[in-house]
Curated annotation (Swiss-Prot):
Its main location: cytoplasm. It catalyses: Endonucleolytic cleavage of RNA, removing 5'-extranucleotides from tRNA precursor. Part of ribonuclease P, a protein complex that generates mature tRNA molecules by cleaving their 5'-ends. GO terms for cellular component: cytoplasm; ribonuclease P complex. The keyword Nuclease applies. Belongs to the eukaryotic/archaeal RNase P protein component 2 family. It is found in: Cytoplasm. One of its GO terms (molecular function) is ribonuclease P activity. Keywords: Cytoplasm, Endonuclease, Hydrolase, Nuclease, tRNA processing. Its EC number is 3.1.26.5. GO terms for biological process: tRNA 5'-leader removal. Consists of a catalytic RNA component and at least 4-5 protein subunits. This is Ribonuclease P protein component 2. The gene is rnp2.
Amino acid sequence: MLKTLPPTIREKKRYISFKIIYNNELSGGEVVNLIRSSLINYYGVWGSSKCNPWLIDYTHPKGLLRITREEVDFVKSALISINEYKKNPINIIILGVSGTIKKSREKFLKVPHEKYYKVIQRRKKENSYKNRLRK
């Protein structure tokens, strides 16, 4: 088994809270594709892999994106540059940048962390129960 890296060697992360203004509701996969394509168009393949984007959470219209600390400005500018999706206008507003998921959810997404975590756990249990019923 591999040991975990000490905090001094780990990659430093930041969490960007954003809000999407769009006519229709987008799924998490569509948001991931939208973010990935905008980063590649704005920053290139090497730059987009360097910022290491990861969608932590998305519930329409707000979401949380994890990126590396050094690439915050590039990712923010790439997200702001998105203006069209499937020939419809779209706008992404950056609500803020935080160092932790908890503070980002409390400050920008206005969701208490503990309650939110319990809701996610309940949804996972419901989905696993539904999957068992399908089998």
